[in-house]
UniProtKB/Swiss-Prot annotation:
Listed transmembrane segments: 17-37, 41-61, 95-115
HAMAP family membership: SecE (MF_00422)
Quaternary data: Component of the Sec protein translocase complex. Heterotrimer consisting of SecY, SecE and SecG subunits. The heterotrimers can form oligomers, although 1 heterotrimer is thought to be able to translocate proteins. Interacts with the ribosome. Interacts with SecDF, and other proteins may be involved. Interacts with SecA.
Name of the protein in question: Protein translocase subunit SecE
UniProt GO BP: intracellular protein transmembrane transport; protein secretion; protein targeting; protein transport by the Sec complex
Bilayer topology term: Multi-pass membrane protein
Keywords tagged on the record: Cell inner membrane, Cell membrane, Membrane, Protein transport, Translocation, Transmembrane, Transmembrane helix, Transport
Organism: Buchnera aphidicola subsp. Acyrthosiphon pisum (strain APS) (Acyrthosiphon pisum symbiotic bacterium)
Gene Ontology cellular-component annotations: plasma membrane
Family from the record: Belongs to the SecE/SEC61-gamma family.
Gene of this entry: secE
Chief location category: membrane
Length: 127
């Protein structure tokens, strides 16, 4: 029991160090952008890009980072399995949606006009 608990904590320490270093990279890039605003833009962009790449590279080696990377890879594979519609099918579907929308709006407009005239007629009767 004690050895298992020790091994579990032993694996958590490198994870914590990695996440602390990732946080330091992000905070450092923020402060470099804020404090050195007078330096050339390209130098700041280069330094911040290097820090972000270090943070992303470190994040890939964490358990959560590996899970995120696996999720992205699986999403990409699923996107390749999708059968996307052709241009002609998309155009026909768009025309159908537009025509049905126009037809339904015309029906609603005519019902609204009839109800409006009916209410106006009832109000004009005045008993």
């Amino acid at each position: 029991m004690n050895k298992h608990h020790y091994n579990r904590n032993k694996h958590k320490i490198p994870e914590k160090v990695k996440w602390i270093s990732i946080s330091i990279f992000f905070i450092l890039s923020f402060f470099i952008n804020m404090c050195f605003y007078e330096t050339q833009l390209f130098i700041r962009i280069f330094i911040i890009s290097c820090l972000m790449l270090c943070a992303i590279g470190t994040m890939i080696y964490t358990k959560k980072g590996k899970d995120i990377l696996l999720y992205i890879v699986m999403s990409k594979k699923e996107m390749q399995k999708i059968i996307w519609p052709k241009y002609k099918e998309t155009l026909y579907t768009t025309f159908i949606v537009i025509s049905v929308t126009i037809f339904i709006s015309f029906i609603l407009w005519s019902i609204d006009s009839v109800i409006f005239r009916l209410i106006a007629f009832i109000i004009s009767l005045r008993f």
